[in-house]
Amino acid sequence: MSQQVIIFDTTLRDGEQALQASLSVKEKLQIALALERMGVDVMEVGFPVSSPGDFESVRTIAQQMKNSRVCALARCVDKDIDVAAEALRIAEAFRIHVFLATSTLHIESKLKRSFDDVLAMAVHSVKRARNYTDDVEFSCEDAGRTPIDNLCRIVEAAINAGATTINIPDTVGYTTPYQFGGIITDLYQRVPNIDKAIISVHCHDDLGMSVANSITAVQAGARQVEGTINGLGERAGNCSLEEVIMAIKVRENMLGVHTNINHQEIYRTSQLVSKLCNMPIPANKAIVGSNAFAHSSGIHQDGVLKNRENYEIMTPQSIGLKEVQLNLTSRSGRAAVKHRMEEMGYQDKDYNLDSLYDAFLKLADKKGQVFDYDLEALAFINKQQEEPEHYRLDYFSVQSGSSVMATASVKLVCGEEIKSEAATGNGPVDAVYQAINRITDYPIELVKYQLSANGQGKDALGQVDIVVDHKGRRFHGVGLATDIVESSAKALVHVLNNIWRAHQVEIEKQRLQQNNQEMV
């Protein structure tokens, strides 16, 4: 009988570390809800002791999750474990994940301790975590370069202390599949209490072997795989969960295992992570890249037309990728748009129909026909703009040419006021940004500007993602329009609203602190 492989997602913890700008609590919750809809068994959503923002994110997600088990990371430090437990305690089911370096290199150069010290720290921390929950994971950081005798000793000790999952990370992506599979085999053969815990693997992609290493580990007996959506992560990234999941599905007969993932949510979740994290998916990315199911060779096209199985080992529909349709125009009613969203897997709670339909009509008037990818882009922006806006772009105009300096006029709604400014700049986008900055007077520095097309052809929606630095903090904004200058302006306004909200949070914190002091 096929055994289950537990899918452990760490997009919101290990994956987020690769981003230039941190995700907001709202954005993290969006991703967490998508992961739960996809059916991940465990999601690691943060490192609570690292910052108040991470603590709040973990607590918010823990409160919302109903089916997926929520996990938080902690070093083998008492405070880390206590704070993680506090952030998680509201969850219906949670896991504390403690980790400690075990390789000789890390122990001597980073921890500057002996292996016996590390062994004692691991046992103490696992026991402390067990005081809060019966689900404790222990990770042997840099296990791939840890002497096997030491690895076996610390795994046995951690299990005796109460660890229910033992994670074997290839922290720097150093091992080969043959070598990594051998490590898992050795653990099963040499650790006497290994049957009392689930063996997990967490592979990085520095040598491009994270997925292969993970699958080989599963063949050797590992029953949990850790990774991120789209392979997001530091350096070369983590193991791509969508690749592992589909490899297990396509080769289930050979591997003898399965997952509980809803495969038809893979594509949608991948797209959401890509947009929110401002990390485009390469066209040739396995499973979710735009070319993953494309056939350009004449021989291949002929073979696919005769039988898709000639050159496709899985279908686009198996990951939730629908065929593009051309059925929506400005004459389409609200019910037609709602029906199409339902066909694409969206629920009423995923978007506001009134504002989505208004945006749809404006786009349909410009484009004539609105495609599925247009609707998905509009729904994404719709979700980002649910919170009240202090700033709203009311109007802009630009004059530019090859021999004249670009000039922009902008009208911005600022709370209850409407303010206007004009400015010149090095091109139309810069001119608009200069005018907006004159209105708001926020000290910001543009760190990243990225333009991408949502859709195909000359009338594709232009999506602009920007990252700005404001007083040492980085904020992300996104704008969408058929006009690049307009989408650029909307992206900056989105950033300004995020900065404004952050200021309001700080003001409220200061007010509460002052009230508490007065009460004392």
UniProtKB/Swiss-Prot annotation:
It catalyses: 3-methyl-2-oxobutanoate + acetyl-CoA + H2O = (2S)-2-isopropylmalate + CoA + H(+). One of its GO terms (cellular component) is cytosol. It is found in: Cytoplasm. GO terms for biological process: L-leucine biosynthetic process. InterPro entries: 2-IPM_HCS-like, 2-isopropylmalate_synth_dimer, AIPM/Hcit_synth_CS, Aldolase_TIM, LeuA/HCS_post-cat, LeuA_allosteric_dom_sf, LeuA_bact_synth, PYR_CT. Mn(2+) binds at residues 14, 202, 204, 238. Its main location: cytoplasm. Its cofactor is Mn(2+). Disulfide bonds: none annotated. Gene3D superfamilies: 1.10.238.260, 3.30.160.270, Aldolase class I (3.20.20.70). Pathway: Amino-acid biosynthesis; L-leucine biosynthesis; L-leucine from 3-methyl-2-oxobutanoate: step 1/4. Catalyzes the condensation of the acetyl group of acetyl-CoA with 3-methyl-2-oxobutanoate (2-ketoisovalerate) to form 3-carboxy-3-hydroxy-4-methylpentanoate (2-isopropylmalate). Belongs to the alpha-IPM synthase/homocitrate synthase family. LeuA type 1 subfamily. Homodimer. This is 2-isopropylmalate synthase. It comes from Yersinia enterocolitica serotype O:8 / biotype 1B (strain NCTC 13174 / 8081). The lineage of its organism: Bacteria, Pseudomonadati, Pseudomonadota, Gammaproteobacteria, Enterobacterales.
